[in-house]
Amino acid sequence: MNFGEAIKALKEGKRVARTGWNGKGMFLYLINGREFQNALKYGYGEYEHEPTITSSIAMKTAQNTIVVGWLASQTDMLADDWIIIE
């Protein structure tokens, strides 16, 4: 699938990856800002001008770390080899 379809899948709660990442355990997923905020019991308007947590794309890396705020490269955006990880 293409990058747009991969983004749609992320928004539906699915994990996605590029076929070239296979075997490395790498994938992307969406961290829902509102759910994260609720889990932290943060953002209930208790303080004036309290910020909210926005959603972001995270990557599980080959080194078994989580990178929050993953950014797509031009190659990633133009690729048609995106897959859904079950």
Predicted segments — roles?
Residues 1-62:
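Extended non-catalytic interaction/regulatory regions in multidomain proteins
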Residues 55-86:
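Short, compact, well-ordered microdomains
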